[in-house]
């Protein structure tokens, strides 16, 4: 088979199963409204949960820092790219979340890949929730360790897998809030089981940090759990981009030596780090608390309204509210029907989610108003097939 034939066959297979992904060009993609092709839509696809991407204080912080530092970092943090802005943000994050150290990464994907591939060795085992993010599962597959996946949120299955003999170390991998289902992991029980088997715990709290817990400290803080490795990302609740790993002093020093994504990548712009510090200040403030309370009320309003519909609603109380429709083509038709009525929603299909669970992944944000939720519900009730 030629290279071109391989490419063509893969694309043909995706088209045949209605799983071909595409990008949409937008002129505004975050906030209450999405603007595409000159038309304005209510935006139910954004991860900007607290509406901070449009916050004037954060925008101003980025602009001022760009004037001071320039628009790029100039290199890896190991060479010339670790600025006072990066250092300040790392120290603020560590203090906020109660860890000795925080290390910044350019993305959550890079952070997960770096930590797992740096830590895991040939005789080790990774035990991951089977619905873990692609960055976690891909990192596990790329590492020399054995990967075992436990049934979603099934702590008994997790315990059985950890009990089987392992010559090396074991790492349990889970998420705080699951990106496609919107539900939360039983973190306290998972941590208890991991410690009983002398395993370390890695929690990716991309969709919980900033949005849940006291001062927005996330799902782990809310549940009284402190994993050995906590990954937080900044493209959701923080409204910016990037990520950080929270860990011990020695693990941070280890990652600075062996995490290749950290060593060999240009660090985030200092202006971005400064904007993230400003975002953290908003998250921790009374304004941040009010934004979280408003979002929680909107989620409750949506769930109360959709319960009477024909759609299957998962047990999700986060900003992520997936409506399971099952069939790929039906999910695409439903997303298009909503867009025709002025509501932008995204159809999620395999391989992102398991076969037979295609869905509309609706995300609510603090930027929405109650009337927006009511409009979405009205359109959904009229769009069922």
Swiss-Prot record:
Top class in the EC scheme: transferase
Pathway participation: Cofactor biosynthesis; biotin biosynthesis
Record CDD domains: KBL_like
A Pfam family annotated for this UniProt entry: Aminotran_1_2
Residues holding pyridoxal 5'-phosphate: 108-109, 179, 207, 233
Binding site for substrate: 21, 133, 352
One of the protein's GO biological processes: biotin biosynthetic process
Keywords: Biotin biosynthesis, Pyridoxal phosphate, Transferase
Molecular function (Gene Ontology), one example: 8-amino-7-oxononanoate synthase activity
Cofactor list: pyridoxal 5'-phosphate
UniProt cross-references to Gene3D superfamilies, sorted A to Z: Aspartate Aminotransferase, domain 1 (3.90.1150.10), Type I PLP-dependent aspartate aminotransferase-like (Major domain) (3.40.640.10)
Catalytic activity: 6-carboxyhexanoyl-[ACP] + L-alanine + H(+) = (8S)-8-amino-7-oxononanoate + holo-[ACP] + CO2
Sites of N6-(pyridoxal phosphate)lysine modification: 236
Superkingdom, taxonomy of origin: Bacteria
Alphabetized InterPro entries for the sequence: Aminotrans_II_pyridoxalP_BS, Aminotransferase_I/II_large, AON_synthase_class-II, AONS_Archaea/Proteobacteria, AONS_Proteobacteria, PyrdxlP-dep_Trfase, PyrdxlP-dep_Trfase_major, PyrdxlP-dep_Trfase_small
Signal peptide: none
EC number annotated for this UniProt entry: 2.3.1.47
PANTHER family hit by this protein: 8-AMINO-7-OXONONANOATE SYNTHASE (PTHR13693:SF100), CLASS II AMINOTRANSFERASE/8-AMINO-7-OXONONANOATE SYNTHASE (PTHR13693)
Role: Catalyzes the decarboxylative condensation of pimeloyl-[acyl-carrier protein] and L-alanine to produce 8-amino-7-oxononanoate (AON), [acyl-carrier protein], and carbon dioxide.
Quaternary structure (record): Homodimer.
Family per record: Belongs to the class-II pyridoxal-phosphate-dependent aminotransferase family. BioF subfamily.
Name listed for the protein in its UniProt record: 8-amino-7-oxononanoate synthase
Annotated source species: Salmonella enteritidis PT4 (strain P125109)
Gene from which the chain derives: bioF
